[in-house]
Amino acid sequence: MKFKDKIAVVTGAGGTLCSEIAINLAKEGAKVFLIGRTEEKLKKVYDTIRSFGGDAVVYPCDVTDKDAIAVLGNEVEKVGGCDFLINGAGGNNAKAMPTITKFDPRELSGELEEGAKGLYDIDMDAFRSVLDINIMGTVIPTMEFAKQMVKKGGGSVINFASMNSYCPLTRCFAYAMSKAAISNLTQSFAAYYAPANIRINAIAPGFMVNERSKAYLGTVEEGLTKRGEQVIGHTPMGRFGQANDLTGCVKWLLDEQNSSFVTGITVPVDGGFLTLGGV
């Protein structure tokens, strides 16, 4: 087992992508702390891990709450301290997104068609919440668990960036800018923590299959939405990503034997989406 006796903290562990990562780390022998807001989802992941004899702890927690993360840190330190941190918590908010893709002067006078929403109509509290969960939800856990990694002589952090880090998608203003920040933060923190032998990298998933994506993209098997057709047409590999497409990259970045000289990078896992200019 590659990660036997290692302790991993996985935030967003109740989601489709990070649950798969957590399960794979447990299969490799790591003790995994499952962090997220919804205890029911975390328990399902826990049950899967326990079904094959893996070791996991369910810990509902808000990653943007510094005090709550400090309490979590104490619990992790009691069993040996964190070796790996996966900052997978994050997301978007429909209230932070317009429904139109280009400025329309009518949005300034409230005269858009019924149901249409421009940039000036978005909910700023929702906008801030997206920045908070994606940026501070990465900064706070990293600073907490890096302290434990220092004591252990090193460790590895993997952040969740996005293809939006490089090229923003339409309507995703808050999400795109926050994910661009994650790529920059990954570089900044990698340089800062390098003297402590803490490596910090990021993965940038492309369009991945989960329950949320099925609603607005559809599926290749059951039929695509218009936006789904655009995505597949722009993805050289001709499909959406699956959660298990991420696990190999994650395990490589965590593995000290294979990536000990790798830090500060963001790895696209997107089926080639970013290789095309769109024309």
Give, region by region, the residue ranges found by the protein language model.
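Short, flexible catalytic-loop segment of classical short-chain dehydrogenase/reductase
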Residues: 166, 204-216
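Short, small/polar-rich loop/turn modules that mediate ligand/substrate recognition or access, typified
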Residues: 194, 199, 261-263
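Conserved glycine-rich Rossmann-like NAD(P)H-binding loop of the short-chain dehydrogenase/reductase
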Residues: 30-44
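Catalytic Tyr-X3-Lys loop
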Residues: 102-140, 158, 182, 237
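Active-site helix of classical SDR
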Residues: 142, 178
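C-terminal substrate-recognition "lid" of short-chain dehydrogenase/reductases
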Residues: 2, 239-269, 274
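Conserved glycine-rich cofactor-binding loop
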Residues: 14-16
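Residue(s) in the substrate-gating loop at a strand-loop-helix junction
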Residues: 162
